[in-house]
């Protein structure tokens, strides 16, 4: 992480000492791409008794951060909101796998397939994204994360990239990364176009720069970090759950406490982004340029890093700020044509640190500035600086100074991220070797150096250091989310649950020694800046050697075990049964903290009794909101345990495992022999079995949700469509005749011969809003389940309410559910929507007379505005 300190970061040592072994053995399922093992809602039952008190509970609290108000730049904010260009290609019908299903494009002539390597390196940045992910994200194990970032400052600071294997957003290395990626596209756009990776590259660059714009709410205020590095590094868990574990403070620089290095680097990134998007999205380009100019003026005015303190110990600005001021000024000159920027670049360059025997990196960009200035001016000051630097990395300088080479050929600079330095120096060498100012005698030397360093990274030694590429690649990177621990322990599970495809690990020591272990952050951590120069190098090599890319590519994985419930009998007798139940949340596709987690313990009511004759009490319960006996059909009943909202999540020993002990009075001990358990996440069955009305245990079908025992709405056989397309609809409800929400798990299947445009689909659900209170819509989960087994989540679903006038029978309000993304619903594909309609105060509805509740054919499906299923209320 640091440039020259060569000291172990204290938080890293703390992790290794503090994290403890633990865990639960888990099994892998073969369901591809599903976020939940089943999609069956909790069957309808009626409440007979509720116990709301608990004797013990586990809770955690963290210090709240002081809120900071800030001004905004109105014109800039408006420009950002109006920008709607996609982050990546829209037509992602399914989430592919890292192996893909074939190759396309120009076959390569190089030693390695640089097209595939480039493709995978870009995917890594999608896996590092923070915030609300777009629907075209090519992964089923990454989810939305850190959606409250900036709330302590009254701002939306969501987005950006997580730095490395941690969950902090450090803007200095992030801006450097976005700058280098942008430089690569600027330099070798044709390589990205030919390999069909331009949209992905631009999507990643835009993702970072849109975040930087959020971080700059006023002329002289810039938020440079979100998350406390020490607190973050003291916890080992997935990014999707970090905000439930700790506060994420926001840190800023301003006129009183400036930070010229980080604001200068961000100005460079935004200037490059403005160039790249000038012809694609002019409005966004102008917004980027406006912020770039403002941030540069801020950095140039104060020339101080006095306020840049929160990153100390992680990303200190060792080289100062003049290198960033020179580097950013050249890019602003290229973006604007304003010669004053070129003059400032030349003025500040000699004031920057001039270490020729290091590498272009997040801290020191003076060599990057020298390359650009050599291209712009051809002056010897810059060409000689670049060549001395590259001579050091290749044949040696005139005075005999030369980089250390490992026995197997890696140009080795430092123990922390050795490959990051070598591949970035190789990128600089490849760019300079093709420039007009490079002496002909050195062109091949620099180019061959670039090829050789890429070869070392990709497999020349018998192993690839790029995850998911080549032979014998690393499988235990130091990365919290990819490792997938649920118990705050980097050794549990022992094998990473996810493949962090495309990431370049730190690399070997000076003797080619390398240890593929999660605990070694020197050699096996990954980081955004590690891949930056490496990506540029791959694109440059593609320009000469080409290479094919994978079709059906992505970070889609088979879903492993995510939930489990273990029960045992604590005690029992002829008239009571005491149960101990342990509920485990090991979710990882993606990791998540359920809003509603419900455990049900099903049993048979003794002959001669009813559920109302029984009572339940608890002697111990962790984060239990309520304990209730519910009557089912026939002689079945269950104990319903509702856990507190988002209390059970994969974040530690206490967080991922919840224990409850309860006693059922009136139930004999032998009832346990035929009992069963089921666990529901937001109304959908995720573990266990549900009994039918006769008491026999049935297992829900994995492809279609099982109907509840008393409230079923099977699909009608003859809907009345008026538009094109043919579908059937089934819906399962999680409530009975009354409740505080209309919660449904709806499946829409394309049974026709023609594909249906997902973007044109809408669903109208009709009901009565008796209290006329404010309404809210929640989509807990939505996805397309393909007939071939693939599964693609949808994150954009929304619901809009309309009054029906005059009122119809069973309907005075409609909820239109739409925004199912792009792509097609092919024949045999199913659109799954788990939704909830509720009042703002969660007051009850009378559900018994709702129009759409009376049958699935009373739910109207439209395609392109025309009804293709269902009947409107008359």
What positions do the PLM features span?
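Hydrophobic single-pass membrane-insertion segments
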Residues: 22-39
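Aromatic (Trp/Tyr) and acidic
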Residues: 95-123, 127-183, 225-265, 269, ...
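Ser/Thr/Gly/Pro-rich low-complexity, disordered linker/stalk segments of secreted
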Residues: 34-107, 697-723
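N-terminal Sec-pathway targeting helices
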Residues: 2-15
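A surface/secretory-pathway sequence property marking extracellular, secreted
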Residues: 605-647, 771-814
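Low-complexity, acidic Ser/Thr/Pro/Gly-rich terminal tails and inter-domain linkers that flank the onset
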Residues: 546-576, 719-740
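Terminal connector regions
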Residues: 648-700, 810-813, 832-874
């Amino acid at each position: 992480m640091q440039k020259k300190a060569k000291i172990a970061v204290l938080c890293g040592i703390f992790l290794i000492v503090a994290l403890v072994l633990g865990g639960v053995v888990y099994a892998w399922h073969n369901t591809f791409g599903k976020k939940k093992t089943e999609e069956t809602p909790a069957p309808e039952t009626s409440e007979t008794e509720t116990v709301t008190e608990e004797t013990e509970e586990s809770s955690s609290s963290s210090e709240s951060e002081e809120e900071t108000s800030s001004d905004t730049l109105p014109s800039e904010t408006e420009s950002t909101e109006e920008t709607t260009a996609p982050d990546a290609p829209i037509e992602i019908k399914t989430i592919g796998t890292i192996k893909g299903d074939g190759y396309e494009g120009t076959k390569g002539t190089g030693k390695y397939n640089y097209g595939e390597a480039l493709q995978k390196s870009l995917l890594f940045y999608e896996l590092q994204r923070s915030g609300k992910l777009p629907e075209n994200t090519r992964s089923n194990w990454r989810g939305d994360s850190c959606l409250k970032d900036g709330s302590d400052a009254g701002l939306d600071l969501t987005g950006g990239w997580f730095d490395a294997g941690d969950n902090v957003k450090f803007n200095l290395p992030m801006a450097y990364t976005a700058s280098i990626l942008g430089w690569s596209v600027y330099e070798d756009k044709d390589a990205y176009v030919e390999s069909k990776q331009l949209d992905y590259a631009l999507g990643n660059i835009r993702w970072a720069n849109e975040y930087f714009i959020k971080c700059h709410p006023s002329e002289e205020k810039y938020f440079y970090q979100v998350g406390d590095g020490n607190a973050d590094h003291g916890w080992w868990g997935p990014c999707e759950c970090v905000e439930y574990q700790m506060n994420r403070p926001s840190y800023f620089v301003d006129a009183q406490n400036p930070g010229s290095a980080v604001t200068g680097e961000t100005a460079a990134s935004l200037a490059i982004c403005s160039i790249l998007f000038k012809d694609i999205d002019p409005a966004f380009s102008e917004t980027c340029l406006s912020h770039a100019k403002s941030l540069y003026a801020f950095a140039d005015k104060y020339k101080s890093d006095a306020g840049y303190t929160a990153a100390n110990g992680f990303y200190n600005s060792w080289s100062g700020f003049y290198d960033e001021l020179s580097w950013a000024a050249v890019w602003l000159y290229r973006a604007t044509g304003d010669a004053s920027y070129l003059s400032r670049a030349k003025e500040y360059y000699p004031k920057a640190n001039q270490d020729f025997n290091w590498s272009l990196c997040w801290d020191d960009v003076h060599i990057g500035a020298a390359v650009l200035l050599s291209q712009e001016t051809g002056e010897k000051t810059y060409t000689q600086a670049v060549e001395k630097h590259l001579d050091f990395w290749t044949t040696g300088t005139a005075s005999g100074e030369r980089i250390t080479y490992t026995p197997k050929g890696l140009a080795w600079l430092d123990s922390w991220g050795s490959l990051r330095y070598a591949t970035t120096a190789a990128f600089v060498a490849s760019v300079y070797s093709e420039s007009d100012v490079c002496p002909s005698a050195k062109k091949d030397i620099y180019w061959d150096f670039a090829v050789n360093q890429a070869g070392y990274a990709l497999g020349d030694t018998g192993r690839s250091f790029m995850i998911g590429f080549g032979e014998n690649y690393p499988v235990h990177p130091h990365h919290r989310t990819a490792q997938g621990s649920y118990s705050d322990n980097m050794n549990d599970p022992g094998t990473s649950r996810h493949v962090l495809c495309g990431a370049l690990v730190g690399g070997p020591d000076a003797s080619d020694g390398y240890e593929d272990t999660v605990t070694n952050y020197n050699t096996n951590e990954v980081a955004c800046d590690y891949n930056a120069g490496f990506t540029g190098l791959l694109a440059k090599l593609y320009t000469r050697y080409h290479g094919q890319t994978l079709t059906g590519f992505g970070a889609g994985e088979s879903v492993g075990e995510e939930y489990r419930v273990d029960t045992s009998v604590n005690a029992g007798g002829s008239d009571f049964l005491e149960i101990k139940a342990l509920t485990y949340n090991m979710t990882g596709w993606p990791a998540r903290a359920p809003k509603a987690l419900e455990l049900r313990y099903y049993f048979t009511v003794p002959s001669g009794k009813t559920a109302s004759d029984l009572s339940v009490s608890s002697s111990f319960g962790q984060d239990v909101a309520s304990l209730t006996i519910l009557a089912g059909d026939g002689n079945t009943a269950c104990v319903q345990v509702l856990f507190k909202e988002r209390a059970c999540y994969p974040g530690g020993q206490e967080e991922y495992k919840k224990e409850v002990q309860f006693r059922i009075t009136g139930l004999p001990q032998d009832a346990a022999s035929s009992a069963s358990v089921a666990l529901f996440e937001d109304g959908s069955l995720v573990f266990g079995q549900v009994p039918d009305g006769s008491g026999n245990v049935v297992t829900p079908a994995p492809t279609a949700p099982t109907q509840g025992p008393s409230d079923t709405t099977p699909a009608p056989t003859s809907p009345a469509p008026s538009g094109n397309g043919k579908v059937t609809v089934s819906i399962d409800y999680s409530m009975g005749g009354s409740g505080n929400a209309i919660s449904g798990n709806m499946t829409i299947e394309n049974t026709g011969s023609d594909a249906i445009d997902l973007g044109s689909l809408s669903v109208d659900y009709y009901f009565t809003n008796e209290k006329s209170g404010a309404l809210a819509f929640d989509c807990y989960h939505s996805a397309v389940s393909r007939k071939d087994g693939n599964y693609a989540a949808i994150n954009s679903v929304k619901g809009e309410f309309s009054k029906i006038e005059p009122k119809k029978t069973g309907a005075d309000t409609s909820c239109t559910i739409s925004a199912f993304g792009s792509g097609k619903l092919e024949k045999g594909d199913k659109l799954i929507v788990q939704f909830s309609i509720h009042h703002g105060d969660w007051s009850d509805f009378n559900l018994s007379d709702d129009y759409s509740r009376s049958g699935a054919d009373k739910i109207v499906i439209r395609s392109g505005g025309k009804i293709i299923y269902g009947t409107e209320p008359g």
